[in-house]
A protein has these predicted regions:
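Conserved helix-turn-beta segment immediately C-terminal to the redox Cys motif
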Residues: 38-42, 50, 54-79, 97-100
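Structural recognition of the beta-strand scaffold that forms the well-ordered cores
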Residues: 42-45, 72-76, 105-108, 144, ...
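Short, internal strand/loop/helix patches
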Residues: 90-139
Length: 170
């Protein structure tokens, strides 16, 4: 009986979803998977170029550089809040590189809420974590994923990327 319970538990653990399950596209339109970052933490951020929080791109890049051995920052441009990401993927990429020197991975534009929510964000907004679940409230919400692809923390937009709250969790 114990062996059966162990087998069931292992089946559940191995079949539980993780961020590695989702098919994504880069801002250049190429297929990619977050699975390439297994073994490192991920900081997934919904971004926008015309938002009061847009200067966080600079801190996100600093975080990506300073903690490159521990975490990969991945930006997901989204136009869900006040039309603050109206540009094309090419325009978004150029804006981020020119104004903030962004070199961390960016996905193509996605929807992070509503009927057309991207599957990754549907998962992230409902996945158990010690902080909170539910719909994203604004641009630059952050999701910290562990080395095994599980959500471990979620931060609202006002939490800066280099805050102690985030850096201690790395």
């Amino acid at each position: 009986m114990k062996a059966f319970a162990l087998i069931l538990a292992l089946m559940f653990v191995t079949s539980a979803p993780s961020v590695y399950s989702f098919k994504l596209k880069t801002i250049d339109g190429k297929d990619f998977s977050l699975a390439k970052y297994k073994g490192k933490k991920l900081l997934v951020v919904n971004t926008a170029s015309k938002c009061g929080f847009t200067p966080q791109y600079a801190e996100l890049q600093k975080l990506a550089d300073q903690y490159a051995d521990k975490v990969v920052v991945v930006g997901f441009p989204a136009n869900n809040f006040g039309g603050q990401e109206p540009g094309t993927n090419t325009e978004v990429k150029e804006f981020c590189q020119k104004n903030y020197g962004v070199t961390f991975p960016l996905s193509e534009k996605v929807s992070v809420k509503g009927d057309d929510i991207a599957p990754l964000f549907k998962y992230l907004t409902s996945a158990p974590n010690p902080d909170f679940t539910g719909e994203i409230k604004w641009n630059f919400e952050k999701f910290l994923i562990d080395e095994n692809g599980k959500l471990i923390h979620r931060y609202r937009s006002n939490v800066k990327p280099l805050s102690e709250e985030i850096t201690k969790a790395l």
